[in-house]
Amino acid sequence: MRVTRRAFLARATLACAAAGAGCSAAGHPRPGPPEIVVERPDDLVDSPWSIWLRGFPPASRVEVTATVAGWGRAPWRSWAAFETDSSGEAALAKATAFAGSYRGVSPMGLFWSMERQEDEKAGPAMALTGAFPVTLTAGSRGGARAEITLDRRLASAGVTRRDVQADGVVGTLFTPASPGPHPAVIVLAGSGGGAWLSPAALLASRGYAALALGYFRMPGLPHGLVNIPIEYFEAAITWLRETVRPREDFIAVIGVSRGGELALLLAASIPEINAVVAYVPSGVLFGPFGPSEPGDNRPRAAWTHRGRPLPHLGENNRTVDWSAVDQKRTPIVERSVYLTMLRDRDAVERSSIPIERTRGPVLLISGKDDDQWPSFDLAQIAYRRLQGHRHPYPFAHLSYEGAGHGITFPYTPTTSTSYVHPVNGRTYSLGGHPAMTAGANADSWPKVLAFLEDARRQRR
C-alpha cells in the first residue's frame, strides 16, 4: 500500500523470528520486515487512525492486540484476526476481522471493542491533559511480529486546565492553546453528578473555552440532584462571560442524560445561551434523585426557579407503574417505568420543557435501544415542540438504532453496557449493542462539531 510523502508514518520496532522473516511461500522476497504503520501516531481521541500491517507472510492470519493503560483501575484490551493480501499487507480500515473482540469491517474496531481486564492492574492514571499510550502488537503463526506504542489525547498540546471555585461556581475550565478570545461551551454531567471532564477537554482541543460545570456531588455543592436552582447556572454564565469573554459572545451548552434534560431547560430559560446539544436527554423534567441537604424541608424537586420547585413527570402521575421494573434484576432496566409515566398526557404537558423559547439552534441525540430511559421518546417530545412552534433556528434529532444510553464522543470503548451508579450503588443497564453505540458515536460527534460551528457563524 502506498502512502503519500506528507503522511507522518510511525514504523514499529519489531521482533521477527527467522522462520517468519524470510521469503514468501511463493518464493518472492517481501519488501521489508514486519511492521505496523500508522499515520499521526500522536492524535486526539476523536480522530480516526489509519493502520496498516506490512511485511507479513502473504495470505496469512495475523492477530493484532490493542492495549491501553491509565483509564481507571484496570487496563483495557482488544484483539482481532485479519488475513494479509498477496503482498503480506492489510489495511485495517478495510480488512475484515474474522475473529476477535469484534467481527467484520470497522476502521476503529480495535478501540471501541476494548474490554476492561479486571484481573490485571493498571499503571498510574494518566493526567487528563496528558497522553494515553496505546500499544499495538501484531503477530503471525509463523513468528513474524511487530509492535508500536501510540498516543491518544483528550487534550491537545497547550490546552490548559483550571479548577474553578469562584462566586459559588464549581467546575473545571479548559482553555485552548491558541490566543483568545474563544467561543464558550458549558458541559453538564448527568445523574452521577460531578463534572463531565473528558468532552470539555476535547472541545478545548477544538477551539472552545469549555467549562465542565458541576451542579451537585462536588465540594461546595448539594449532595443530591435535589432543588438545584436555575439561578446557579445564571451565575455560572455571568462568571464565564466575565472570565473568558467569549468570542462573538457565543455560549453553547452540552449535557448528557439528566444533564441533557438540564441543558434543554437552561436553553429555554436563559437568553444568553446561543445553542444547545443534548445527549440522550429528556424533553420533560424528571424528579429529584439522591439526598436532600440537611435542614432543607422544602418539597423535593430536581430544579427550582426563583424559589419555586419546577413540576416534574412523576409528580401526581396517574399512569406510573413501578412494577414495570424488576428491581431484583441485575442490571436494572428502567426504561419500562418511564414509558408508563408518559401515558399521562396531563403530566407530560405540565412537565414539558418550553424548548421553543431557546434563542438558537437545538441538536438532540438519542439511542433507540436505551435501557436507562427511553431517550428517543423523551427527545422526540422536545423535537415535536420545536416543530409545532416553528422554531426559527435550525433543529435536529439524531436517533440511532441499536444504540444505548452511552452515546458520547467516538473511538473509546463501548463494551460496558451496564454500570454501578455512584449515587445509590445500584447496577443499571445502559442498553445498546457495543458496535451500534460505537457507530452512533462516530456518526454524531462530527455533526456536533459542525453544529457548533454553524451556530457560531449565525452569531457573526
Give residue spans per PLM region.
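Serine-hydrolase catalytic core
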Residues: 323-403
